[in-house]
Amino acid sequence: MAARRVLKAVLVDLSGTLHIEDAAVPGAQEALKRLRAASVMVRFVTNTTKESKRDLLERLRKLEFDISEEEIFTSLTAARNLIEQRQVRPMLLVDDRALPDFTGVQTHDPNAVVIGLAPEHFHYQLLNEAFRLLLDGAPLIAIHKARYYKRKDGLALGPGPFVTALEYATDTKAVVVGKPEKTFFLEALRDTDCAPEEAVMIGDDCRDDVDGAQNIGMLGILVKTGKYKAADEEKINPPPYLTCESFPHAVDHILQHLL
């Protein structure tokens, strides 16, 4: 492990890293307290599109995580930012619980398609409506393209397969705004006043969390919780800076070796 400049910021994934649905990863709350006691800024980054930022924050606080809304950067926020920049009227293929994060966005007579994780809306009629909009030239905005995610009952399809289906059917390419896009990580770091080389990312997804972060110069720590499967660390090049059992182990390493 190469020597690094002093670490200034830690980005932490949420689902699969700190919690799995309504259960915290064992020891995660105490580990977060120890990390906060160190001379480092902590931010939370997530591709979760199943609920609004406020609902997500409420879930985390019920699990006794000490987190403020300003510390969370979500792919829903990144999607809204792009919608406003492009001044489009999106067809929102997102979970109903995520809609509060799009309050005020004009959706009448849509001229764009925004797709996140929306299991109840991924049926033929709505997907075909999106298909026709794309054929007419509407841009496709993917909140993220995760292949799958972890639920209490096992792994489940993410939005990625549905985004890819629309890309294939319409011969178009989605603009992706969430992890592992470089712009997502840079936006998440913007208020920390530190360079990517002065930050580390902790997550359970080797591609979206670790590879995405390392591609902009951050360190990437892969945890074996959430969606992690055996040998995931061998799927990316370069491999993760560190692969460890869980978030508390990642915090131990940071406190002992990076600060």
UniProtKB/Swiss-Prot annotation:
The cofactor remark states: Binds 1 Mg(2+) ion per subunit.
Any GO molecular function: enzyme binding
Q: Which InterPro entries match?
A: HAD-like_sf, HAD-SF_hydro_IIA, HAD_sf, LHPP/HDHD2
Disulphide connectivity of cysteines: none
Q: Which cofactor does it need?
A: Mg(2+)
Binding-site positions, Mg(2+)? D13, S15, D204
Q: Which domain of life is it from?
A: Eukaryota
Residues annotated to bind substrate: D13, L14, S15, T46, N47, K179
Entry's Gene Ontology cellular component terms: cytoplasm
Coiled-coil-forming residues are 49-71
According to the UniProt record, list the residues that bear N6-succinyllysine: K50
CDD domains of this UniProt entry?
HAD_PPase
What keyword terms does UniProt attach to this protein? Coiled coil, Magnesium, Metal-binding
Q: Which family does it belong to?
A: Belongs to the HAD-like hydrolase superfamily.
What this protein is called in its record is Haloacid dehalogenase-like hydrolase domain-containing protein 2
Q: What is the protein's species of origin? A: Rattus norvegicus
